[in-house]
């Protein structure tokens, strides 16, 4: 059995330390009020038993709380007072420097919480450690100086989650849609170097990767680009190759007709497209940003984003090559092709690619094979999205998420035209719906009262995020604010005008709708008797966003939070506050956003149809998924799911497994098992390899693909997922 020390380091549970701490307090009281040795031993044994029953590693603070509880039960109030006083004195001493232990444990790779905090960061690498060290300082400043005490307390207790506190001390925003078109067509500046309009497709791809890296280093959230912004450069290369071919043959005294020139130019063009797409794939996975990780980049593939004709056909060629290269994968250090985490791919399903006889159906078939093997692309239904995202002109719009799942709301610019690329999200604060429910003790009136109190906390926390960005000069990130990624502001000009009027969004996140409904009604939100309550909860969240938007002229939007690592924190906080309630707080995770619980048996089609109604109520972002087995030999079934997505839900993905054991070469599913301490570990079923450095495991974490393993809560959630096909 293990515990988590205050610095995040994992240690063996040592009951002697509990006994010694009680003995120390016991000696400080008069003899008539002291506990006997037997009573002290009983307390220690009771605490050990309770820790074992929790089936997870408790923190030192949680164990100390148990000690206090046991002392109070025995009416040993004097001993309890001494124990609490000593604990308080030690806490004061620790507060004199709040970061040393955390940072030292990071450097020595001994911090278990950080090791599993981000499934796309390797905490043993120097560059990642530097980012985490800076993050510890930022969190310390945020907690002690920048945030009100009640918001910090609510965050610590798991009532809300104030996201990305490790970046809050700086004036940084969350995620965005990069205006690659403006930067490539009109030029940009990277590291004080003028970059003019590219003269070829491959150069455009190279410039795009440099932009991606610069943008990632200037923000903490994900970014998205669209391949349609690269498509015009295909014809730039085509015309260049036509000219080259013609000149080469004229040099040797030969004349070719246009048909032959075009044929030779197209051959060279295909190689150019392969080279350009390969540049993006390999640059993205090998670049290291100042965040200590590869850029969290999403690439959008949407045919109808460009006019019909040659430009759309050129875009189709880029999409085809992108899918082929992703299906192939990238080689790991052993030379084996594996599934890369990035870039995340999104493929738009539309009228001209969804039916077997449609013009671009061959791309949809290729996308299906790619999803079956490499977990991407994810899918946006143009049809459904245009029904949900209607702008002020009354036109439905289709555009990508910012990174994983955060969506902008429709916006019309000063020229009366829809605008999406160049917009961003200011940040996220998430409400723990499970805690709202459990705090109400099933009293419905009390539930709505507590709900509103927690929403007020979220509102004030979100305004802290907004105020942190307000007054930010464009100079803090020239690539974003001055050179076209998001705007073309002047030097010294603040970004304030971009924070209001719907240009950017700010997100109220929510988590644990399933557990909330389960506690209040005794039923899953899939039960027809419980679904109306779930919808009512969602509507209440949206109503709060509407009220705040009208008050502040800021685009508050409801967001289905992925809670990648926060799921474990919320679960631990809930168990600490309410104990283990069956099907509510008895897991080491809570359910993402509105999702059906991972253990609930339901087929893929019913799941997507049911969840679509909640996706409509998450305008700030949400994604649904279905868990599937190896589908590489059943592409027809994958295509059937994709067709269902097109007709029923805006944004969805298929989760499968893509693993490799470097110890024995096994490429099937790596299993999750418990070790002798009850900790969940990854094990190769073929050779028994347990060394995470000797295996490649790719799982959908929360929209992105994670490849650096997960905390115990998320690992349990992954282990318990049932198949939907």
Where are these regions (language model features)?
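Charged, amphipathic alpha-helical regulatory modules used
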Residues: 1-110, 719-724
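Long insertion/accessory domains within large nucleic-acid-processing enzymes
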Residues: 686-725
């Amino acid at each position: 059995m293990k515990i988590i020390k205050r610095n995040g380091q994992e240690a063996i549970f040592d009951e002697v330390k509990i006994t010694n701490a009680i003995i120390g307090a016991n000696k400080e009281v008069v003899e008539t009020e002291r506990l006997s040795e037997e009573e002290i031993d009983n307390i220690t044994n009771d605490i050990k038993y309770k820790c074992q029953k929790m089936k997870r590693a408790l923190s030192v603070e949680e164990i100390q709380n148990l000690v206090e509880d046991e002392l109070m039960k025995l009416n040993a109030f004097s001993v309890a007072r001494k124990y609490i006083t000593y604990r308080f004195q030690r806490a004061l001493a620790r507060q004199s420097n709040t970061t040393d232990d955390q940072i030292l444990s990071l450097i020595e790779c001994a911090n278990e919480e950080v090791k599993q905090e981000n499934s796309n960061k390797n905490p043993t690498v120097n560059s990642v450690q530097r980012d985490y060290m800076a993050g510890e300082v930022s969190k310390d400043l945020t907690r002690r100086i920048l945030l009100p005490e009640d918001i910090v307390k609510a965050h610590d207790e798991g009532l809300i989650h104030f996201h990305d506190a490790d970046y809050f001390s700086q004036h940084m925003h969350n995620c965005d849609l990069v205006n690659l078109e403006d930067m490539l067509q009109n030029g940009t500046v990277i590291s004080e170097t003028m970059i003019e309009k590219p003269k070829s497709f491959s150069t455009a791809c190279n410039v795009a990767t440099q932009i991606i890296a610069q943008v990632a280093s200037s923000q903490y959230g994900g970014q998205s680009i669209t391949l349609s912004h690269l498509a015009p450069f295909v014809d730039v290369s085509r015309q260049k190759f036509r000219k080259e071919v013609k000149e080469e043959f004229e040099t040797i005294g030969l004349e070719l007709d246009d048909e032959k020139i075009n044929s030779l130019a197209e051959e060279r063009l295909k190689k150019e497209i392969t080279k350009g797409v390969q540049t993006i794939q390999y640059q993205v996975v090998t670049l290291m940003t100042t965040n200590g990780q590869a850029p969290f980049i999403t690439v959008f593939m949407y045919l109808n984003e460009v006019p019909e004709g040659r430009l759309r056909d050129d875009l189709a060629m880029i999409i085809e090559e992108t899918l082929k290269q992703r299906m192939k994968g990238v080689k790991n250090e052993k030379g084996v092709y594996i599934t890369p985490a990035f870039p995340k791919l999104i493929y738009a399903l539309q009228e001209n690619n969804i039916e077997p006889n449609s013009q671009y159906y061959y791309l949809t078939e290729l996308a299906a094979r790619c999803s079956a093997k490499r977990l991407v692309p994810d899918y946006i239904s143009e049809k459904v999205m245009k029904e949900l995202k209607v702008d002020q002109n009354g036109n439905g719009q289709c555009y990508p998420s910012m990174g994983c799942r955060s969506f902008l709301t429709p916006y019309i610019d000063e020229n009366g035209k829809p605008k999406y690329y160049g917009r961003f999200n200011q940040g996220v604060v998430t409400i723990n719906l499970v805690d709202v429910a459990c705090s109400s003790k099933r009293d419905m009136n009390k539930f709505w009262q507590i709900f509103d109190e927690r929403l007020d906390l979220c509102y004030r926390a979100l305004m802290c995020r907004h105020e942190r960005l307000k007054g930010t000069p464009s100079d803090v990130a020239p690539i974003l604010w001055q050179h076209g990624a998001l705007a073309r502001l002047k030097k010294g000009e603040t970004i304030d005008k971009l924070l209001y009027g719907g240009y950017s969004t700010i997100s109220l996140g929510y988590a644990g709708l399933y557990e909330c409904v389960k506690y209040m009604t005794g039923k899953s939100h899939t039960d027809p008797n419980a679904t109306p309550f779930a919808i009512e909860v969602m509507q209440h969240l949206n109503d709060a966003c509407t009220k705040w938007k009208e008050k502040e002229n800021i685009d508050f939007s409801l967001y289905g939070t992925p809670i990648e690592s926060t799921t474990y924190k919320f679960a631990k906080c809930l168990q600490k506050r309410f104990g283990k309630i069956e099907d509510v707080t008895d897991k080491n995770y809570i359910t993402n956003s509105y999702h059906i619980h991972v253990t609930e048996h339901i087929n893929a089609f019913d799941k997507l149809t049911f969840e679509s109604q909640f996706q409509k109520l998450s305008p700030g972002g949400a994604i649904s998924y279905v868990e599937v087995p190896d589908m590489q030999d059943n592409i027809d079934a994958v295509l059937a799911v994709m067709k269902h997505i097109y007709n029923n839900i805006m944004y969805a993905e298929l989760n499968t497994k893509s693993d490799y054991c470097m110890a024995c070469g096994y490429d099937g599913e790596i299993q999750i098992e418990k070790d002798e301490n009850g900790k969940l570990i990854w094990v190769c079923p073929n050779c028994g390899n347990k060394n995470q450095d000797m295996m490649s495991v790719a799982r959908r974490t929360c929209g992105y693909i994670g490849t650096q393993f997960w905390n115990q809560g998320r690992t349990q959630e992954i282990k318990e997922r049932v198949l939907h096909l």
